[in-house]
Design a protein with these regions (language model features):
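N-terminal secretory/targeting leader peptides
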Residues: 1-184
Length: 184
């Protein structure tokens, strides 16, 4: 099981075939193994890899829970779902239609988040029945390990700095709000 980044040392972990994913896993101390999603089950079963980074869904839809008995939450990577629209299209809508569009976007986001949460809850129950143990971790040590990657990506792509700064600001505000809620 993985509780801290140190637990990853020497482990072979499947990642998506991208330089960023490989570097991230290397920074956490594991040996990154780029591999297609469909090969993971057999690779874990045969000991080619020790684990993989996937959502909970892989435990049941791909039956990874049959061969991988620990699932660690460290949030080293979070893939957001986005609703995207053409800016010219949006700006060309009459105010009443734009209001309807914005409301539909808000509602669809709420529905998607709720449906995802319900599906994950169901998947976790199924995975637990397969013998999978879910592990909550302190995410900060994992975050610290990958900070050099943030710096590398921003150095190579300076146009991303304002977007990165905006995301960090939003994240910090959310974390501050959570901290205040816990202290009340």
């Amino acid at each position: 099981p993985v509780y801290t980044p140190d637990d990853l040392k020497g482990m072979k972990i499947r990642v998506q075939a991208s330089p960023t994913n490989v570097r991230m896993m290397d920074l956490m101390g594991a040996a990154a193994v780029p591999m297609s999603y469909g090969e993971v089950y057999t690779a874990i079963q045969q000991g080619v890899i020790d684990g993989a980074e996937n959502s909970e869904m892989a435990l049941t839809t791909m039956k990874h829970g049959e061969v991988a008995k620990y699932y660690t939450y460290n949030q080293h990577q979070i893939v957001p779902d986005l609703l995207v629209a053409n800016l010219k299209f949006l700006e060309g809508l009459p105010p009443e239609e734009r209001k309807i569009f914005d409301e539909a976007a808000r509602i669809s986001t709420e529905v998607e988040v709720q449906a995802w949460d319900e599906q994950i809850e169901d998947v976790k129950k199924q995975a637990e029945e397969m013998g999978v143990v879910f592990i909550e971790t302190d995410m900060e040590p994992f975050r610290q390990k990958v900070l050099p990657l943030h710096e590398e990506v921003l150095k190579d792509n300076p146009r991303l700095v304002p977007i990165y700064d905006s995301i960090q600001s939003i994240q910090n505000a959310a974390l501050d709000g959570e901290e205040r809620s816990r202290n009340e």
